[in-house]
Amino acid sequence: MISTNQFRNGSAIRVDGKRFTILSFQHVKPGKGHAFVRTRLRNMDTGAVIERTFRAGEKVESIRTDSRPMSFLYRDGDLYYFMDQETYEQVAIPEDVVGEAKDFITPNGEVSVLYADGEVVSVQPPAHVELEVVETDPGVRGDTATGGSKPATLETGLVVQVPLFVSVGDRVRVDTRTREYQTRV
């Protein structure tokens, strides 16, 4: 059990029998009445984001989480297979648990797999990944009236806006949190 005064972003808690990750929290002390903590929580099982208010000092159950580095091996149907880099065990993770991270996973690519209560709850790619451009329109010299960017399909199927000078075969760095082009590598 932890007090609402001990909340930290990324902490895992159990509320009403459901597992949540704390996305953000704010302690509020109104002029009248008791202090409270306003939070944004992500359900670990469904991915839904909710807002919840707790009384200051209220106790909630904390969940032990463990993050393990893993390498992506292959995909078979809707299962993604990863290898734990410490124990060399293979772990099969369903596509719905992998979620949006699938857009950034390449063969032998490293990810962080989050376990809660001994079960996989999420797959998190690194903050930046380098992916190859497999399809994009050729950039026409002097064509900057459209803002200087064009859509490009990357090797994982992700489509991002890239500058006109990027062509098929180039490798680009993408920010996995914003899903935006960063630079050509």
Swiss-Prot record:
GO terms for biological process: peptide biosynthetic process. SUPFAM superfamilies: Nucleic acid-binding proteins (SSF50249), Translation proteins SH3-like domain (SSF50104). It is found in: Cytoplasm. One of its GO terms (cellular component) is cytoplasm. InterPro entries: Elong-fact-P_C, NA-bd_OB-fold, Rib_uL2_dom2, Transl_elong_fac_P/YeiP, Transl_elong_KOW-like, Transl_elong_P/YeiP_cen, Transl_elong_P/YeiP_CS, Transl_elongation_fac_P. SMART domains: EFP, Elong-fact-P_C. Pfam families: EFP, EFP_N, Elong-fact-P_C. GO terms for molecular function: translation elongation factor activity. It comes from the Bacteria. Involved in peptide bond synthesis. Stimulates efficient translation and peptide-bond synthesis on native or reconstituted 70S ribosomes in vitro. Probably functions indirectly by altering the affinity of the ribosome for aminoacyl-tRNA, thus increasing their reactivity as acceptors for peptidyl transferase. Belongs to the elongation factor P family. This is Elongation factor P. The lineage of its organism: Bacteria, Bacillati, Actinomycetota, Rubrobacteria, Rubrobacterales. The gene is efp.
